[in-house]
């Protein structure tokens, strides 16, 4: 900066360009000579632009010199110098800072490079490990393949050896069979030859003894003829003498006639008495063919199960609705029927006929049995489907059932299940003559009230009954599907019967996990919508099956809910299988339409 401030000034150099100007000619304002101008005129525009880049413009230096002179003459020259020094120091500091930053960036880059190298090395090691594992797996596969090939080869060798052995055995067996066949053939030939020789010898002997044999036959026939004639003569003589003696003695004639009359009377009397006794025994001791189940004493059944009959004789009347879960209004009505039936038996009044209709599995048969036990009556169950196969014997069988019912001293509750099978409408239904005759016999035996038996009919489709059957009914009770509260009560009942009681009894393979039974039953009651009481009871049996099928014999909440969900799905599937006619019948029975074909169920 000293040259700017005027220090250490040197002498001005002589202007060398002047000499060049003088020797080369006058210069133009741009400092170019005439030779240059002439040369430039000969150059192209691109060449001229390239030449202008190497030319020096001294005007900038002149302006800098003028600025330096102005600065030296200024009174603030020292402050400007200090300011320039400070600016220079600041720039130096900034430069050093940038250098440090660059060095830090370089170090960071080195660290990053090392990290990348380590990462690459780690990836390389992982890849090498993977490659080694793949090679090991490949080697293992190869070894397994070789081992399998060896096993296959050994198996083929064994099969080949076995095949050869079987072929050898077959050849030996064939040779043995051929040997045996040859022996049999030779024996047969020998036997035929021997038989031929024997027959020839016998024929030769017969030809030689022909006269002797004919004489024997002639003598034998003559003797037989003489014997037969003598027997006929003797029998005729005896019979003639007896007839002559009887006809001449009237006392013997009367005695013979009386004996024959008594013999005929005894035969026919024994035959009639046997029929009467057999019918009496059948009515008092046995049971009719149509009756499938009864609580009346049967001698043969008592011999088979004596303990069962002793327990039944000692049993006391129970509540008619014990163990039966129904709608409260329906329970109230059934209880009234049970009380009225019991008082009717006590007072020897006339029993009323009852029709119980509704979906299957809603407790109709169970209530009929409970009603008979509560009233102290005997019960008998017959199925309407058993009448049609009997054909012409159906009328006789129905009369036997009612005759048998009249012989009960305690009163009989006759329960006809699936009664619509043979009590159909005679006008619209196409029924056979035998079934029509059986229906007429049933109508004849139920035309009046009876103090000996009570008739209870059960049907899923009561609209198919003949009008005369409806006229003989005094009470019609509809059994509906259980509601939410009834389902929960049923679930609690069967959970106690099939789960809690066996678990409390200490069964070997029956353990119960700890969970909230009441809450679980409430959940299942919501899931079992549309299910009947029978289906819910089968659900209880499925819980036992789940315990017996498990490894540890422990019943958990999950197992209970899974079985319930499966039962609900099966119920929906059964409903989906119904035809259009069955869906209409289902709607008429339950009052609700069957579910759609799609199976959707909310899982607990």
UniProtKB/Swiss-Prot annotation:
Record keywords, A-Z: ATP-binding, Coiled coil, Membrane, Mitochondrion, Mitochondrion inner membrane, Mitochondrion nucleoid, Nucleotide-binding
* Entry GO terms, CC: mitochondrial inner membrane; mitochondrial nucleoid; mitochondrion
Q: Where in the cell is it found?
A: Mitochondrion inner membrane; Mitochondrion matrix, Mitochondrion nucleoid
Residues holding ATP: 358-365
Question: Mind telling me which CDD domains this protein's record contains?
Answer: RecA-like_ATAD3-like
From the UniProt record, give one GO term of the biological process aspect.
Answer: mitochondrion organization
Coiled-coil parts of chain? 62-221
Answer whether the UniProt record assigns the keyword Nucleotide-binding to this protein.
Answer: yes
* Superkingdom of origin: Eukaryota
Q: What is its main location?
A: mitochondrion
Q: Does the keyword Coiled coil apply?
A: yes
Transmembrane region(s): none
Q: Which ranges are annotated Polar residues under compositional bias? A: 8-19
Compositionally biased spans, kind Basic and acidic residues: 29-50
Pfam families the UniProt entry points to: AAA, ATAD3_N
Q: Where is this region: Disordered?
A: 1-50
Gene Ontology molecular function, alphabetical: ATP binding; ATP hydrolysis activity
What subunit structure does UniProt give? Can form homooligomers.
Q: What does this protein do?
A: Required to maintain the proper number of mitochondria in neurons and muscles.
Q: What name appears for this protein in its UniProt entry?
A: ATPase family AAA domain-containing protein 3A homolog
* Source organism of this protein record: Drosophila melanogaster
